């Protein structure tokens, strides 16, 4: 079994003043660390426990946390932003309206969490928006990354990897505020999940777990504005020298696989793994394949780091 610290709070400096980041660690702290960065509106518990355990079993020290404006981390209550106005400005090349924070600020939060834990470096894994944050972290703080894993994410080029209309509607529509209604509505997210492995009972169970821990749809508009305001990373990705693995599913309709393919095309020497029957999620039957690929990538990066290859 993994050594689990239980939830803890890190008080870190940020662009808006000190904030609290809720985090959890699993495994031996002396092992190479992997920092797991979640996506839009997703909490640390959205990383499946079994997924984390598999990485621990492969010899890694796993850290998962709540981004600001999500879960049990600091929330910017009452800070109003119009993500549609930000998107329109970004799309037309106009001046971006003020936003509370950008992906760079979220990446800095992750770096400050590493500082809090006394870790100089870690493997950086990000899923969806978390992949955007992970890419930004490695671009802006390359010395902190032992490797990069970009999981069903995109480059910030708006024309590549855009969601289908059905997926966008499911993502951006206001969720029910009543607990039972929220749980009952959760299968709608199946539109972008792995169809072959879709389990409605499990989806509703996880929705209940997430709702009971923290229901905070208000944070989504600010996270979305951060994505839009940050723009394309294409130019910077071409300069990366960090060992990079890009993973995407063939059935992803939220961020379709051309976004992952483009990421891998841009990052020099990167590896692209396209997983059949995988959507915008981590279904249990695919966890051995996915964690195995991640572990092999990180172990190769560790060997290259140790030998200078």
Describe each PLM feature range:
Residues 253-259:
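Conserved alpha/beta-hydrolase "acid-adjacent" motif
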Residues 92-100, 104-122:
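Conserved acidic catalytic loop of the alpha/beta-hydrolase fold
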Residues 139, 148-177:
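Flexible "cap/lid" loop of the alpha/beta hydrolase fold
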Residues 163-235, 239, 262:
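Alpha/beta-hydrolase
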Residues 131-142, 148:
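Short glycine-enriched nucleophile-adjacent loop
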Residues 19-93:
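Conserved HGGG/HGGXW glycine-rich cap/lid loop of the alpha/beta-hydrolase fold
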Residues 240, 246-248:
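Short beta-strand/loop motif that positions the catalytic acidic residue
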């Amino acid at each position: 079994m993994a050594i689990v610290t239980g939830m803890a709070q890190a008080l870190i400096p940020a662009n808006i003043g000190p904030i609290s980041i809720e985090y959890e660690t699993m495994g031996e702290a002396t092992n190479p660390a992997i920092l797991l960065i979640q996506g839009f509106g997703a909490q640390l518990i959205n990383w499946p426990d079994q997924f984390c355990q598999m990485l621990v079993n492969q010899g890694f020290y796993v850290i998962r946390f709540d981004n600001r404006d999500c879960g049990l981390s600091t929330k910017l209550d009452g800070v109003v932003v119009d993500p549609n106005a930000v998107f329109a400005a970004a799309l037309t090349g106009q001046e971006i309206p003020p936003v509370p924070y950008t992906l760079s600020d979220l990446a800095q939060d992750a770096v400050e969490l590493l500082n809090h834990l006394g870790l100089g470096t870690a493997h950086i894994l990000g899923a969806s928006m978390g992949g955007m944050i992970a890419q930004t972290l490695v671009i802006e703080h390359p010395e902190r990354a032992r490797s990069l894993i970009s999981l069903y994410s995109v480059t910030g080029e708006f024309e590549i990897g855009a969601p289908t209309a059905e997926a966008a509607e499911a993502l951006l529509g206001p969720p029910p505020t009543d607990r039972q209604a929220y749980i009952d509505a959760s299968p709608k997210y199946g539109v972008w999940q792995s169809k072959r492995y879709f389990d409605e009972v499990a989806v509703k169970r996880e929705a209940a777990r997430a709702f009971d821990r923290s229901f905070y749809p208000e944070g989504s508009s600010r996270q979305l504005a951060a994505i839009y305001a940050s723009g394309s990373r294409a130019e910077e990705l071409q300069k990366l020298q960090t060992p990079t693995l890009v993973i995407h599913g063939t059935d992803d309709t939220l961020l379709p696989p051309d976004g992952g393919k483009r990421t891998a095309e841009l990052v020099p020497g990167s590896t692209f793994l396209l997983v059949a029957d995988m959507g915008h999620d981590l279904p249990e039957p695919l966890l051995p394949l996915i964690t195995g690929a991640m572990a092999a990538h990180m172990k190769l990066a560790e060997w290259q780091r140790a030998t200078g290859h």
